[in-house]
Amino acid sequence: GRPNPVNNKPTPHPRL
């Protein structure tokens, strides 16, 4: 996936 914003996640966000 690509680095996505917190509010809008088009792809599964990585574990931050």
Curated annotation (Swiss-Prot):
Q: Where in the cell is it found?
A: Secreted
Please state, per the UniProt record, what induces or represses the expression of this protein: By bacterial infection.
Task: Classify the main location.
Answer: secreted
Q: Superkingdom, according to UniProt?
A: Eukaryota
Keywords, sorted A to Z: Antibiotic, Antimicrobial, Glycoprotein, Immunity, Innate immunity, Secreted
Keyword Secreted applies? yes
GO BP annotations, alphabetical order: defense response to bacterium; hemolymph coagulation
Question: What post-translational changes are documented for it?
Answer: O-linked glycan consists of a Gal-GalNAc disaccharide, O-glycosylation is essential for full biological activity.
User: Which GO terms of the cellular component aspect does the record hold?
Assistant: extracellular region
Q: Which InterPro entries match?
A: Formaecin
Annotated glycan sites: 11
Q: List the disulfide bonds.
A: none
- Described purpose of this protein according to its UniProt entry: Antibacterial peptide. Has activity against E.coli but none against other Gram-negative bacteria and Gram-positive bacteria.
> Can you say what this protein is called?
Formaecin-1
